[in-house]
Amino acid sequence: MKVAVLAYDGVFDSGLAAVHDVLDTANAMRDMLDRPPPAWDVTTIGAKRRVRTGAGHVVATEPLRHVADAELLVVPALAERRPDELIAYVSGPGSEPGRRTVARACAAGTPIASACTGTFLLAEAGVLDGHRATTSWWLAPVFRARYPDVELDQTRMVVGSAGVTTAGAAFGHVDLALSIVRHRSPALAELVARYLVVDERPSQSAYTIASALAGHDPTVAAFESWVRARLAEPISLPAAAHDLGVSERTLQRAVRRTLGTSPVRFVQDLRVEQAAHLLRTTGLSLESIARKVGYEHPGTLRELLRDRTGKPVASLRG
């Protein structure tokens, strides 16, 4: 399978390397299977013969025209953590060759894959419109505001939709590369994951910091603070809206617009986050922790913890 990996100035070093390393490992381990899949023939392409990564390393590339021969185009992330600078880059002249390459690959029916901030380049090129996608959890409010036509689910680690596969934050590149291997051979993907000591991570929820998301909107940030001060109490949305000086409808819309979820779900996320913190840092029983975060029955909290983190309570203990 011919794979073209798009490199550009400022590309995230670990993202670029992860794709190569996982696919190289898969190639090295193919013969360990009775029925190995075809090898992955990986080529790094770019608008310039040499690009400088985010960490300052120089990477040689082949011309962008090689994408015409590719059976898969992979777009690693940009090493940029500032939302304003990220948007400026993916919408600016520096990324125009990359956007064109992505759009042409999509028009030709070539599958495309990307992770973390690289998903912004795909969205800017228009290939995610009307489709499901994920991105870095902490950039979800920015992504959702700029690309409203994309059905964003930042809780997922890997999302595939209409020939485009997206993955979550930073080291989600490993999950993305494993999904590429898994598409051809689940057995080989399992083997590679074991050798690289990589756990399956279907969700980003366990890594999400609710306050980092809420801070993108003043109303949501105020609601978060209001809820955190009352985690052990029943939460009333009308009371919260009254205390914050907004209508209940305005509060609901602000939460939905910023977080892509309901106020009730956000309150649950805050309670689960605090419960997980107490499990890691204290010796309190689950019953005591449940009461501290507003649940009468520990079984309810147990189910929510497993749902949000994908882990049993025992594994969350420090």
Which residues does each predicted region cover?
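Short, well-ordered alpha-helix to beta-strand connector turns
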Residues: 70, 109, 130-131, 161
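Active-site segments of SGNH/GDSL-like serine hydrolases
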Residues: 119
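Short loop/edge segments at beta-strand edges and connector loops
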Residues: 46, 154-156
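Structural detector of well-ordered beta-strand residues that form the stable sheet scaffold
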Residues: 112-113, 134, 153
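An amphipathic alpha-helical interaction segment
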Residues: 137-140, 146, 151, 159-211
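Short beta-strand and adjoining strand-loop segment in the mid-core
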Residues: 122-136
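Extended, subdomain-level signal for the structured scaffold at the beginning of enzyme domains
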Residues: 1-112, 122-123, 189-190, 199-318
